[in-house]
Amino acid sequence: MVTIRLSRGGAKKRPFYQIVVADSRSPRDGRFIERVGFFNPIAQGNAERLRINLERVNHWVAQGASLSDRVASLVKEAQKAA
């Protein structure tokens, strides 16, 4: 099953997440099919906090991909801002 979920990057105590389309059997930070955005939970100043390619997310959902709970809330936030 294909899932759209967060993949953690960044340094210790400074998380940075890639929003990726991945097989649900793959490790959290492992192999993925496509990167569709990023999320920076500790963005400060004029740094960009969230960027999602909604067109690609909608494409993958139409193909049967499921969204993780956190990504679903981020997509809703991005749609509201757009």
Curated annotation (Swiss-Prot):
Keywords: Ribonucleoprotein, Ribosomal protein. GO terms for cellular component: cytoplasm; small ribosomal subunit. GO terms for molecular function: structural constituent of ribosome. InterPro entries: Ribosomal_bS16, Ribosomal_bS16_CS, Ribosomal_bS16_dom_sf. GO terms for biological process: translation. It holds the Pfam family Ribosomal_S16. Belongs to the bacterial ribosomal protein bS16 family. This is Small ribosomal subunit protein bS16. It comes from Haemophilus influenzae (strain ATCC 51907 / DSM 11121 / KW20 / Rd).
